[in-house]
């Protein structure tokens, strides 16, 4: 399932956590899991929780934990909240919530009424089986000109700025950028091997290749695309610029 596309798509079954620093615009994968339920019996939700627990063991303390609504299970939300961290995630429109003045009376997220003030500040709601969250409604214009209404929630109840909320949510798109670069630059989807171990090794090597390109790009102040293309470009310039380049002799 792709939260970006809003439908099931064909892709690599990899779940990963990405660290992003908005001050330097650096983004790096800190952990990943290959989804293979038949092999280990774990769902993508299980992998997400395992990686979050491992990140805490490694003393990661991010300002925000961002993820798609597909992973917004009560179990993961509670893990993040108990770790005293702030999450911000998209919420499905059929999730049940209760208003401040109507506690115990639940309704779907998309059935809530919104005043002009609440459009800017969000509104406090009680998420069933979890607790208080601040909910924002954001209308996005899609490339085809249509509009899509999205709902996002956070446990940072003091956040009352839609502009700030959209800025924070924008950080989440770095995961899409990472996957796009991984696919376009490393051939992670083009493994020809049939053995499971070989396929896993291919994915691991592809991620390592991206890391090498990223390190070179940051060191030279260029993009990862240029970091891959430049060595070949420099070589071709050198060879084509040499008048004494080797030529096959004509047969006598």
PLM features per residue range, with description:
Residues 23-252:
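Single, function-defining residue in the core of a domain
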């Amino acid at each position: 399932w792709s939260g970006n596309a809003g439908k099931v798509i064909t892709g690599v079954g990899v779940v990963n956590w990405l660290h992003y620093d908005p001050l330097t615009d650096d983004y790096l994968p800190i952990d990943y899991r290959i989804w293979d339920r038949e092999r280990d019996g774990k769902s993508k939700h299980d992998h997400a929780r395992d990686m979050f627990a491992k990140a805490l063991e490694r003393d990661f303390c991010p300002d925000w934990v961002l993820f798609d609504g597909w992973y917004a299970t009560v179990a993961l939300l509670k893990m993040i909240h108990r770790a005293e961290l702030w999450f911000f995630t998209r919420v499905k429109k059929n999730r049940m919530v209760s208003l401040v003045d109507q506690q115990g009376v639940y309704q779907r997220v998309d059935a809530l009424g919104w005043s002009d003030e609440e459009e800017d500040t969000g509104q406090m709601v009680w998420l069933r089986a979890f607790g208080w969250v601040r909910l924002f409604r954001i209308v996005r214009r899609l490339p085809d000109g249509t509009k899509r209404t999205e709902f996002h929630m956070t446990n940072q109840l003091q956040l009352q700025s839609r502009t700030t909320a959209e800025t924070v949510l924008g950080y989440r798109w770095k995961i899409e950028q990472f996957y796009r670069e991984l696919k376009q630059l490393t051939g992670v989807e083009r493994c020809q091997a049939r053995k499971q171990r070989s396929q896993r090794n291919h994915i691991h090597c592809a991620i390592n290749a991206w890391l090498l390109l990223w390190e070179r790009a940051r060191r030279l102040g260029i993009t990862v695309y240029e970091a891959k293309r430049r060595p070949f470009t420099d070589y071709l310039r050198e060879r084509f610029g040499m008048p004494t380049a080797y030529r096959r002799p004509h047969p006598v």
